[in-house]
Amino acid sequence: MAFVWKRLLGTIPSLIGVVVLTFFISHALPGDPAAFFAGPAANAASIENIRATLGLDRPLPVQFLHYVIDLAHGNLGRSLTTGQPVLTDLIERLPASLELSSFALLFAISIAIPMGVWAATRINGGVDHACRGLVTVSAAFPTFFVGLLFVYIFYFLLGWAPQPLGRLNEITFSPPPHVTGAYTVDALIAGDWPVLRAALSQLILPAISLGLFALAPIARITRAAMLEALGSDFIRTARASGLPVRKILMTYAFRNVLLPVSSVLGMVFSFLLGSNVLIEQVFGWQGVGAYAVSAVIASDYAAVQGFVLMMAVLYVLLNLAVDIFAMLVDPRVRYEG
């Protein structure tokens, strides 16, 4: 428990830095939220009245002080684009982004880890070259380009995929009863199989588009860690003892791969949450990424600051989860930390 508290306390300076930088950078962005809120037909006097109502006429340090006081009370402000509290908006949209990122990560893991292990056992062979080629290709193409390409091929040309217009075709299906906010999980809990199939069909293309970019770091780290493990003394001893190859790989070598792979998975998942911004725009996904884009376009300071702060907190929690997992896999981490 002391290990966890030490890690949490160590994140406080980082979160303070995020709050300060996000506030001042968002206020330095071009655009006037008062003018956006007033509309194109508003005159200068109306815009000034709205600016005063929103508190934007105050000096920047005074605005920052009020922002920090509101944060201390759990208030992230009110979004100009939706009219709702930012915290409410983020809570409503976060499950959609987590669902998409989780499926993308599962897709990447299911391909990258077996491929990395297989490539390491056949160094410089056909599988190894194929692995390195796939890693290079998956890292070379932007996620939004892959998403657009998939939409063109699988929806427009072949007609295999549903319309890329969100999480569910709500003309045909109603969302499942809200439990977690993730449609696939909620449909599974409710036992609503038609909605589950419909939600999965909407999820496949964006998850694969996002997951392809995650293949590269996971496969690369898995291959490198497995090569290092296979070249270690204890593996050579196990081979000399006549142990089955499968047991050597899965029981001894793969255990040593878990620590570096788990570390990179935390970073990859946080990256996927950030990359949702582009994929959600392509597929009409109603997540926090699309919300952030709308907020930036409208110079919606409160929404932008809330999004960045939420991402920072999620990143901290992901790293804490990775540290705890590393401690369970290798107790030496507890003492080294």
Regions found by a protein language model. Name each.
Residues M1-F3, L94-V127, T143, P175-G337:
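Alpha-helical transmembrane segments of integral membrane proteins
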Residues L8, I50, L60-L76, V86, ...:
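Hydrophobic alpha-helical segments of integral membrane proteins
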Residues T11, R93, S97, G133-A140, ...:
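Residue-level signal for discrete positions within transmembrane alpha-helices
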Residues S14-L65, F154-V195:
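Hydrophobic alpha-helical transmembrane segments of membrane transport/permease proteins
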Residues V18, T22-S26, G147, V151, ...:
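Juxtamembrane/transmembrane-helix interface segments of polytopic membrane transporters
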Residues L29, S138-F141, L273:
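Transmembrane helix irregularities
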Residues D57-I113:
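An internal, D/E-rich "acidic patch" concept
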Residues P114-W118, V127-T180:
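Hydrophobic alpha-helical segments embedded in or immediately adjacent to the lipid bilayer
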